[in-house]
Amino acid sequence: MTDIDARLREDVHLLGELLGNTIRDQYGEAFLDKIEQIRKGAKADRRGSPGAELSASLDQLSEDELLPVARAFNQFLNLANIAEQYQLIHRRDESQPAPFEARVLPELLARLRAEGHSADALARQLGRLEIELVLTAHPTEVARRTLIQKYDAIAGQLAAQDHRDLTSAERGQIQERLQRLIAEAWHTEEIRRTRPTPVDEAKWGFAVIEHSLWQAIPNYLRKADKALFEATGLHLPLESAPIRFASWMGGDRDGNPNVTAAVTREVLLLARWMAADLYLRDIDHLAAELSMQQASPALLARAGDSAEPYRALLKQLRERLRATRNWAHAALSAAVPAGAEVLHNNRDLLEPLQLCYQSLHECGMGVIADGPLLDCLRRAVTFGLFLVRLDVRQDSSRHTSAMTEITDYLGLGRYEDWSEEDRITFLMRELSSRRPLLPGYFKPSADTAEVLATCREIAGAPAASLGSYVISMAGAASDVLAVQLLLKESGVLRPMRVVPLFETLADLDNAGPVMEKLLHMPGYRSRLQGPQEVMIGYSDSAKDAGTTAAAWAQYRAQERLVDICREQQVELLLFHGRGGTVGRGGGPAHAAILSQPPGSVAGRFRTTEQGEMIRFKFGLPDIAEQNLNLYLAAVLEATLLPPPPPQPAWRHLMDELASDGVRAYREVVRDNPQFVEYFRQSTPEQELGRLPLGSRPAKRRAGGIESLRAIPWIFGWTQTRLMLPAWLGWEAALSKALARGEGDLLGQMREQWPFFRTRIDMLEMVLAKADADIARSYDERLVEAELLPLGEHLRDLLSQACAVVLGLTGQSQLLAHSPDTLEFIRLRNTYLDPLHLLQAELLARSRKQQAPQGSPVEQALLVSVAGIAAGLRNTG
């Protein structure tokens, strides 16, 4: 297809027209004409006409016009996103094939059967998959929950107007509702005035479950069950939940002093309240539906003397759910003991639902059992009483400081000064000791008290409400043992997964030896229940070394971990800390999973889902269903049909690419003394720290570029369209390989090795979104004269990267093989270009005026950030 679907253009045109009506109503025809002039100027500029007219139009805007112009283009981009999302899930003619997301699992199951996999083995493997998607807050998630709900309602009206049998009056009513919703969105502030709290972020995550995933989970499982039955004649077991959810919102305290033990407790209680409330809605619906009299002896024994036994049993469950909800609500305000009626165990939720289900089937009413009751059962298996499992994350340095304070107090010396072997000896001895390490009168510092308070919250919370304890910047076996000891001292007597997160290039290279040392310790092995979980960091390794070297280090670390766990006869669970952007390990999940090393996805897969990508991937039930299908199919395929290990020649060339890539990356980022100052002048990085975008500070406590968090590092370059972290290093690595005459080998790797093909595909995607002209416009407006040559050099490197990828793929244009995607990017550019130029102007004015927070310039700047993030479909 060379042009975007005409119906998508119709929707974009309609939504734009309705937005125009709203803007005209508030600001008049002349202002709307000015917006249209800017839009047409951007379009002409893209077609090669002189861009001076567009720049002049923006330069002439008065201070009062800056904010409404920025808001107009921001809203255009959000409406275009809605139309595009709708296009992805609807409007398929019967003559067209089903979308890939709907076909992927049935086609995979058919292929597996054809290749000799037995029906029993397939059904068993699909039912046993353990996929956990970990929802994380995002310091740059810019869309307010209020607006997201209005955007979802707009998508609903697009679906309503698609019915073919509408009368003209009904069609008119839909357009009126669309007009009203767009007006509501326009007259709602798109940017929050204050930073969200960690609890606000957790509520945002719960809202995604309430409004989308609650519906999507039973829908995708119903279709997976149908696909399995068609391929094997077998059904998914009732207790099967291949995909579950965890969360970092309210548990991730790494670099965020706002996440305290009290916050973690509050979020755990809120999750219990929300879960009980959602089940109560389901039970009310089921009680109205299940009016039947005939029931199995087992159900009748539980229901007592009732003419409507199903309703009687559900009434008992409803009373317990109400008690649970009321207790959780009261416990948010004060410590309240839980009464006997409060539900604490998932079995108590599941058992009455399963009893109803089995009874209906036994009494010949399977068609009723397999309706909303089955949906409720599958939600209960997936979400349980706690909705999501909350992870706790903290930096290893905080644990080292706490241990140092403790050993210092006890007169044992300073833990932080000890060798690794001395630390391990001490920690293993204390872990096996029956006496407490800490005396009751120990008075820790505020930081250590907070670490211990968090561990006590873990001790007091139900095990099923918690996920893993993740240690950021882990680099040694003692990092894991120290957390185990702190948990033990705080009363955590049950096993809890303590997960090292290996982030930098050096730590990734050291991940194998660290885990090998741990797994050789008998005391450690005896405490390990279930799989050994290890987290692979994508963001910091890419910031440290560039994506070329980081991607290869991540791959090799996983290979080594697979080998070590196989040798030690321990099951491995790899946890992937991916971001939304290519520079942070993001990209299409299906391709990414299939590109993992063989053996690394053995029926288990855990990954983070980042703030703004949660909205795009799971914000609407139909979109969520598509993405759940992709995860399910990809993990099943990677488990049963893993890729072959890379050939020695590929490994050798990848070593060369990584070495050349990291050298080229660090020459720019670390060795050029002008680089940090150029970054700060040419991007909105400094301004981002002042904007109320998330609960976590954008920088760690002190330091230069190393202290900058990976997210704003990516965000700054994304806003200016240079996209530097995602490609820098590849241009040198690939060019040198071609110069050595290794082009044929690169082509073979791209053709036959999923890992390399996926890396090149993601590189091509980000290069297609990059724009040297836009990046230059920021330099011209913001950068001091002596730094301009560096900007020109970086844009030259971008051109080299584009040229070498085109040479490798044999195309004349990036994404020529994906015209739909290319057209989506072009459609957005018409609205993005004015926002970029306007943002550069706003940055210049803000820096010159030292604009205070809340000023029109600052507000317009924040809106431009939000609009560009929406237009590019990712932030950091």
Swiss-Prot record:
It comes from Pseudomonas fluorescens (strain ATCC BAA-477 / NRRL B-23932 / Pf-5). It catalyses: oxaloacetate + phosphate = phosphoenolpyruvate + hydrogencarbonate. The lineage of its organism: Bacteria, Pseudomonadati, Pseudomonadota, Gammaproteobacteria, Pseudomonadales. Its EC number is 4.1.1.31. It holds the Pfam family PEPcase. One of its GO terms (cellular component) is cytosol. Forms oxaloacetate, a four-carbon dicarboxylic acid source for the tricarboxylic acid cycle. GO terms for biological process: carbon fixation; oxaloacetate metabolic process; tricarboxylic acid cycle. The active site is at H138, K543. This is Phosphoenolpyruvate carboxylase. GO terms for molecular function: magnesium ion binding; phosphoenolpyruvate carboxylase activity. Keywords: Carbon dioxide fixation, Lyase, Magnesium. The keyword Magnesium applies. The gene is ppc. InterPro entries: PEP_COase, PEP_COase_bac/pln-type, PEP_COase_Lys_AS, PEPCASE_His_AS, Pyrv/PenolPyrv_kinase-like_dom. It comes from the Bacteria. HAMAP family: PEPcase_type1. Belongs to the PEPCase type 1 family. It is an enzyme of class 4 (lyase). Its cofactor is Mg(2+).
